[in-house]
Amino acid sequence: TNKRDTIRLAFGAEGDLGSTGWEYSAYYQYGETQRAQVSTRQFNAANFKYALDAAQNADGTYYCKDKTADAFGCVPINVFGIGSITPEMSNWIIYNPMTFSNIKLHVAAFDTTGDITLGDYTFSAAAGIERKEESSFELPDGLQQKGLHGGNQIPAEIGDQDSTGMYVELLFPLIEGMPYVDNLVMETAFRQDDYSTIGKTTATKFGLLWTINDEWTIRSVVGEAVRAPSISDLFAGASQTWTGIPDPCAGLGTEQGGSTNANVIANCNSVATVANAITNGSFDAEQGLTVPGLAYSQLNTQNIYGMVGGNRGVGEETADTTTFGIVWTPTFDPNLSVTLDAYEIEIEDVISQLSASVAIRKCFEAAPASFPNAFCDQHTRFASGHLESWSSYVVNQSFYKNKGMDLAIDYTFDDLGAVPGSLSTSLVMTRLDNHMYRANDEDAGTDYVGEIGHPEDKAKLRFLYTNNDLIVSVDTTYIGDVVDDLSFDHGVGN
């Protein structure tokens, strides 16, 4: 079962600040969601252990040796033979897992807008302050947290953060009523937030809006944006998984030979435990003998586990954005509007979890002079040289760059002749020139344009018919050719 209770309260006010000509708006919002999730008839590994550890009474019956478990009704279990497990035994080793979660948010804000006059010059301004407090927790029961419910460990997640932010926006008219400059306006904005978890962050914006005449407008904005880590990014517990990852060193020293990459071969041989296995062989427990090279049996592969979770040391990610656009609204047909925008977005210190398989590959494919590198910290090995574990925690390590163009054409047919109502059409086309991802400063980067999820060309055409209360919409979407990354030549070994 899954029971969810949600409450939301919001209060707001707006008005004039006396006779100053300034206006204000203020609000307070509170929201809370509680969830109780209960599953049924899951395996109780702890009770199963107690049930197996049984002894025989003088009368031939059995009892659980653990006195505490016995006091709580432990039922000895017989796992041998068809039908040997009775309903009483079954009921002792099953239970109903429970998980409780809560998300709570308080937000209060005050904003004001108006004009500022300095002599003969007037410009517009807006300013505000915001206070936000958020907290959340997710608490699996004790067996789930210990991994004794027949599955992986599911840790508790408990965290909170609060922030106080303030912003100022200014709009300056520069030129108006001149040839080729019907209006020129400059806008600037600044915002600073102080987080209880990561400290202070700032965001800025600078833009120009140049109205040439009634038909043509040019616009451009340069800004810096910030995204703070979420509670989950910061406080998510380390979850266990038994998903294996490929070892670049596997097969070296065997008849198959393993990797042919010179960097991989050199780096693997520089790790003492791996080099020993490559030279002297590795023990195969399934066969009970030593086999050549660093060979992986099914048992070796199944023993690899991973840990995935948050990181209280993660910081904010920042983005530098640049846009430049042209708007055409022809006077001969006011129902037509055409906009063309070019954009470039660079995001640094991206909050992300790098794939463990990618990390270990980049660890060993690096030039020997830079080995071991930061990627190598995300895995450990047994003394035999085989992989033991991998980790993937939230970090600030990645870089994204998006660059492209958007074209939008809108037209409205007000008069459909004998057909009542109106018809609006909208065509939006996107050309993606660059979608670069770089895991960290040591990574040369990969351009994913043309791969699944990042087509070079996309388009969406919409027809919207309205007639009083009747609304009919028809959409069609075009996605350009894409390829699977397994067959796409990145030059990085995929």
What are these regions (language model features)?
Residues L17, Y28-A36, I129-F137, L174, ...:
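Transmembrane beta-strands of outer-membrane beta-barrel pores
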Residues A10-D16, T113-D115, Y167-P173, G207-T211, ...:
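Transmembrane beta-barrel domains of outer membrane proteins
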Residues I7-F11, K104-T112, T164-L170, T202-L208, ...:
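Hydrophobic, lipid-facing positions within transmembrane beta-strands of outer-membrane proteins
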Residues W22-A26, L118, F123-A127, D182-T188, ...:
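Transmembrane beta-strands of outer-membrane beta-barrel proteins
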Residues T241, L423-N494:
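C-terminal beta-barrel architecture of Gram-negative outer-membrane proteins
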Residues G18-T20, T117-D120, S163, I175-V181, ...:
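Outer-membrane beta-barrel channels and translocator barrels
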Residues D160, D193-T202, T318-D320, I409:
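Solvent-exposed loop/turn segments connecting transmembrane beta-strands
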Residues T1-T164, P179, G223-E316, T339-D406, ...:
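Surface-exposed, low-complexity loop segments enriched in small/polar and acidic residues
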